A protein has these predicted regions:
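Nucleotide-state-sensitive switch-loop elements of NTP-binding domains
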Residues: 2-11, 16, 20-136
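Short amphipathic alpha-helical segments and helix-helix/interface helices
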Residues: 26, 96, 143-144, 167-168
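Structured helix-beta-strand junction loops
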Residues: 32, 149-150
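G-domain G4 guanine-recognition motif of GTPases
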Residues: 97, 127-132, 150-168
Length: 168
């Protein structure tokens, strides 16, 4: 029986670097562990999934396309996650919701039956595009709410900013 799988939600706006972070994490995966990655694509074409999918020992991928994971009572998500967990029997689970989704609603679903005994939710990780924020891009209300709840905020893409923008 599967239980207490460390589960990491890696969220943020479109283009913030979620898929790149997951690729970097996968490169650091201990050889003896099995990991699973569930990716949500808002559209029907799974670009992020295509970027991640490759033959990698001990890593299983699944994708839920066509809307955010928490919508439509989460039925596609529930099915996709259930199938992934049964197939992969992972030691760790990474979930990348769409940058257009509602990650806090997804976390609420994961805290409910049947997942509460199966998954050990870790504090969410939120990536933000520092260059976009410095240029005046605004976070949606759901992104602002996640930023307040995140265990780790990563300001990505800051290398193009001058020192004043990075520190101020």
């Amino acid at each position: 029986m599967l239980n207490d799988i460390p589960t990491h939600l890696i969220a943020g706006p479109l283009g913030a670097g979620k898929t790149s972070l997951i690729r970097a994490l996968l490169a650091q995966k201990p050889a003896g562990e099995r990991w699973a990655v569930l990716i949500n694509e808002f559209g029907q074409i799974g670009l992020d999934a295509a970027l991640l999918h490759r033959d990698e020992a001990g890593v299983s991928f699944a994708e839920v396309a066509g809307g955010c994971l928490c919508c439509v009572n989460g039925v596609p998500f529930q099915i996709g996650l259930s199938q992934l967990l049964r197939k992969a029997r992972p030691d760790r689970l990474l979930i990348e919701p769409s940058g257009l989704g509602h990650p806090l609603e997804l976390l609420q679903q994961l805290r409910q039956p049947p997942w509460q005994q199966v998954l050990a939710l870790q504090a969410p990780v939120m990536l933000l595009d520092a260059t976009a924020l410095a240029g005046g891009a605004a976070l949606t209300p759901s992104q602002q709410a996640l930023a307040a709840e995140a265990g780790l905020l990563v300001l990505n893409k800051s290398e193009g900013l001058d020192e004043a923008a990075r520190t101020g």
